[in-house]
């Protein structure tokens, strides 16, 4: 095939968003991406009676990915903790973690295998991969190497990589903005002016995982230690009962003075139900607040009594702040942007990611807030001048906006632009 046409790109651009918890993937033709958990199960320590029933090709690979496939073999593996591998921490795989890279390669293979192509005109996928803005250079190289290796198994025409916050800005058609991407592992605050302004990148070492962790501790306190061990159950409870307070102290005061108003139940299965009792109704607000600001006495007491840790971490030359609140992170990010363009960049703050997907139950509008309102209130308290000039909004699809931006980027990026390690732009063409 000669020149790749726009019509071709509208069919065969393929987006992959490698998140800490989920990989979202699929061609540009989808309304929304497919999702698979970012994990893999190594088939080690298997009893002989189990090995006999596993297909030889699966056994030979020694590794399975895909939600159904992992569940299928999970009960057969003796040491689940050793053999169930989550390759990304804060969106980054360690350079020397061979098992993590095996899982990422298998996930890349799995995502492409879901979309076989029989079109005789098919010259290969245009793959646009979104990685954490914290991803170091070695991770870019390793991802390119993975797709180089897969090119012999799947037709891949070219591969490009972009940072997740830039993908969100593209999906939102925002040229000047601050993207606040809240994932499971971390929160990335990234100023954008046509491209990512790396000097202004601020990262927080918390996200949806910390909301899960405090939910787990609350479940233990109210007598559901068995359920607290199951990550799936914890996630469901968090989503169902977690609340973001407008202001934490006022919300706790309201819940303690009228606990019946905040009592709730969650049915996890036909035979399992979780009830948040009156004396713990106020803790619902801690679940949402920990994402926005963990600097409260009530949250710190849970941290001290549990294995939950909120502390700084370092990835490459970037410090991830554990206790910095989201509003302070936005202000810090903007201070590192050239004064000349600060006001333009600050004109809109766009929230994205599952960590910002919170709802306000009917009748609780006086004490609970959605993410946009919570950030506005915090900015008004920290910087009234900034708050008066900025529009804060949530993307329409918080979980999918990175993938959507990736496929738009892959569709629009000129194929004449070859990859540059310096600018981190362009296409890499697999060795043929």
Swiss-Prot record:
Gene3D superfamilies: 3.30.420.40, 3.30.420.570. Keywords: ATP-binding, Cytoplasm, Cytoskeleton, Hydrolase, Nucleotide-binding. Pfam families: Actin. It comes from the Archaea. InterPro entries: Actin, ATPase_NBD. It is an enzyme of class 3 (hydrolase). GO terms for cellular component: cytoplasm; cytoskeleton. GO terms for molecular function: ATP binding; hydrolase activity. It catalyses: ATP + H2O = ADP + phosphate + H(+). ATP binds at residues 20-24, 182-184, 235-239, 354-358, 399. It is found in: Cytoplasm, Cytoskeleton. Forms the backbone of an actin-like archaeal cytoskeleton, which is involved in cell shape determination. Has ATPase activity. Shows highest activity towards ATP or GTP as nucleotide, and only residual activity on UTP, CTP and dNTPs. Belongs to a conserved five-gene operon within Thermoproteales denoted Arcade (actin-related cytoskeleton in Archaea involved in shape determination). Belongs to the actin family. This is Crenactin. It comes from Pyrobaculum calidifontis (strain DSM 21063 / JCM 11548 / VA1). The lineage of its organism: Archaea, Thermoproteota, Thermoprotei, Thermoproteales, Thermoproteaceae. The gene is cren-1.
